[in-house]
């Protein structure tokens, strides 16, 4: 993949917004209280755009979304030591962190298709909600906050000016 930083696992992130310009976030099963946007690894031979569509479907059940924009460079974050040891055992590598291609997508149908336990992959999330951009950054784990801030700043011009305070629609699966 072009310009992929060495030592970083290739990954994609999805900033999914609804018609109110709120961002989809979900709380991780293995890190209670940590909210994040959908993301996941890019498989061998897979293009980042295809990986983003696949990850969104696998993690949320969402297939009704259109790609609006993408960040034109890889954004990176480093794993803290404890996380690095765990994920390197899990993934079988020596990664410093992740290099991510981010995509802005808009939900094009009803949120009723959101299903955190699609059966395609082991569930990663306990619950989900729509959040305003500031909340997305504040509720992320510390080491992802700078990346989330850059993603939100990059994509804000594409929002339609509807961003309102968080409308929590948490749903446990």
Positions of the model-derived regions?
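Unchanged
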Residues: 42-142, 173
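Acidic, metal-coordinating catalytic segment for phosphate/diphosphate chemistry
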Residues: 1-19, 92-93
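Entry beta-strands of beta-propeller and related beta-repeat scaffolds
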Residues: 22-23
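A short gly/proline-enriched turn/hairpin at secondary-structure junctions
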Residues: 36-39
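Charged phosphate-binding loop/patch that engages nucleotide di/tri-phosphates or the phosphate backbone
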Residues: 133-173
């Amino acid at each position: 993949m072009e310009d992929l930083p060495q030592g970083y696992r290739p990954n994609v992130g999805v900033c999914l917004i609804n018609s109110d310009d709120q961002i989809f976030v979900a709380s991780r099963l293995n890190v209670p209280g940590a909210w994040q946007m959908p993301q996941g690894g890019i498989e061998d031979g897979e293009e980042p755009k295809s990986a983003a569509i696949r990850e969104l479907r696998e993690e949320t059940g969402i297939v009704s979304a259109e790609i609006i924009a993408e960040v034109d460079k890889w954004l990176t974050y480093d794993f803290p030591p404890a996380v690095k040891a765990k994920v390197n055992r899990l993934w079988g590598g020596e990664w410093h962190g992740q290099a991510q291609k981010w995509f802005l997508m808009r939900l094009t149908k009803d949120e009723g298709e959101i299903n955190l336990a699609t059966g395609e992959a082991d569930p990663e999330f306990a619950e989900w909600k729509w959040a305003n951009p500031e909340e997305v950054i504040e509720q992320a784990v510390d080491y992802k906050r700078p990346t989330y801030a850059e993603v939100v700043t990059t994509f804000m011009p594409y929002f339609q000016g509807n961003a309102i305070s968080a409308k929590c629609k948490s749903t446990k699966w």
